[in-house]
């Protein structure tokens, strides 16, 4: 049984005079099964960290700790949790979609975290469905602001890429001041001359390695390696050694590397194609055999009759 995640945020989605209730649920979760603690190397006991006053060294309980803003060196003003909760920020309860843009206009570097957007209850379903359909047909994303996790975020709300999914997607975005200038970092790259033959080979290599994107094909190999390490420790066996890739020979230049890469892809494609062809022939042969056997049985029945 799948345990449904609880809403992370609930409030109103507003477009001009249209307003209805929605809930946001995080679209991602951590699947890591390996969690490390800090332990003492000699005793193996877990190390605990205490929060202490710097002058007296006296430990402070969590219930006695509040946030503080340092307005001068070593001087703070306390800020209670209630003070933050009572901030008069409209986006804490309402996402007001201020403008709509084509989804492709949003720079992928702006995206932070995805959320599923659902109608808050059955009475909100009609308005939700109308807005969702309009976003899907126009290919637009609504841009607004939302207060989450102690700060305000830009948020883009759009229809999912799969039309069979009847919800909406929300993506928190970074503000302009959070983005580093790409021009500043790329300015030192010189526009080198591109060799037409090298470009042709690079295009061919990309084309041969192109396929439909399937996220399930990619696995977290680092997590797997950590699991092997932990299992080896538990069983008191030698630690698994990392396989070193065998050298493929010295690459003379870019042209040579491109040609060899395209050649390897050609060989791989032929190998896969041959295996698939043999599999199809084997399958057809088995089907013919079944037909022959089936026919033999019917002949026997006719003879016995």
From Swiss-Prot:
<feature type="domain" description="Ku">
    <location>
        <begin position="16"/>
        <end position="202"/>
    </location>
</feature>
<dbReference type="Pfam" id="PF02735">
    <property type="entry name" value="Ku"/>
</dbReference>
<comment type="function">
    <text>With LigD forms a non-homologous end joining (NHEJ) DNA repair enzyme, which repairs dsDNA breaks with reduced fidelity. Binds linear dsDNA with 5'- and 3'- overhangs but not closed circular dsDNA nor ssDNA. Recruits and stimulates the ligase activity of LigD.</text>
</comment>
<comment type="similarity">
    <text>Belongs to the prokaryotic Ku family.</text>
</comment>
<comment type="subunit">
    <text>Homodimer. Interacts with LigD.</text>
</comment>
<keyword id="KW-0238">DNA-binding</keyword>
<dbReference type="InterPro" id="IPR009187">
    <property type="entry name" value="Prok_Ku"/>
</dbReference>
<dbReference type="GO" id="GO:0006303">
    <property type="term" value="P:double-strand break repair via nonhomologous end joining"/>
</dbReference>
<dbReference type="InterPro" id="IPR006164">
    <property type="entry name" value="Ku70/Ku80_beta-barrel_dom"/>
</dbReference>
<dbReference type="GO" id="GO:0006310">
    <property type="term" value="P:DNA recombination"/>
</dbReference>
<protein>
    <recommendedName>
        <fullName>Non-homologous end joining protein Ku</fullName>
    </recommendedName>
</protein>
<feature type="region of interest" description="Disordered">
    <location>
        <begin position="263"/>
        <end position="305"/>
    </location>
</feature>
<dbReference type="GO" id="GO:0003690">
    <property type="term" value="F:double-stranded DNA binding"/>
</dbReference>
<keyword id="KW-0234">DNA repair</keyword>
<dbReference type="InterPro" id="IPR016194">
    <property type="entry name" value="SPOC-like_C_dom_sf"/>
</dbReference>
<keyword id="KW-0233">DNA recombination</keyword>
<keyword id="KW-0227">DNA damage</keyword>
């Amino acid at each position: 049984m799948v345990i449904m995640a609880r809403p992370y945020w609930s409030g109103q989605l507003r477009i001009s005079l249209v307003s209805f209730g929605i809930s946001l649920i995080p679209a991602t979760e951590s699947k890591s099964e390996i969690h490390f603690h800090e332990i003492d190397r000699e005793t193996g006991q877990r190390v605990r960290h205490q929060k202490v006053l710097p002058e007296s060294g006296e430990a402070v309980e969590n219930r006695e700790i509040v946030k503080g803003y340092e307005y001068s060196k070593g001087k703070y003003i306390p800020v209670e949790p209630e003070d933050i909760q009572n901030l008069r920020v409209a986006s804490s309860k309402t996402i007001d979609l201020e403008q709509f843009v084509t989804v492709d206009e949003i720079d992928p570097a702006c995206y932070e975290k995805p959320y599923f957007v659902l109608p808050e209850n059955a009475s909100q379903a009609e308005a939700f469905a109308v807005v969702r359909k309009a976003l899907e047909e126009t290919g637009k994303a609504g841009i607004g602001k939302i207060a989450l996790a102690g700060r305000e975020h830009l948020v883009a709300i759009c229809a999912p890429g799969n039309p069979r999914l009847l919800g909406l997607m929300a993506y928190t975005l970074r503000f302009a001041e959070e983005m580093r200038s790409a021009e500043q970092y790329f300015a030192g790259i010189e526009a080198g001359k591109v060799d037409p033959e090298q470009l042709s080979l690079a295009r061919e290599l990309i084309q041969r390695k192109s396929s439909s994107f399937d996220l399930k094909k990619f696995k977290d190999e680092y997590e797997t390696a950590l699991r092997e390490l932990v299992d080896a420790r538990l069983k008191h066996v030698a630690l698994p050694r990392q396989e070193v890739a065998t050298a493929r020979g010295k690459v003379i230049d870019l042209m040579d590397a491109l040609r060899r890469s395209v050649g390897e892809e050609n060989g791989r494609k032929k190998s896969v194609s041959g295996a698939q062809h043999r599999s199809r022939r084997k399958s057809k042969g088995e089907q013919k055999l079944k037909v022959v056997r089936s026919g033999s049985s019917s002949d026997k029945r006719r003879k016995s009759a």
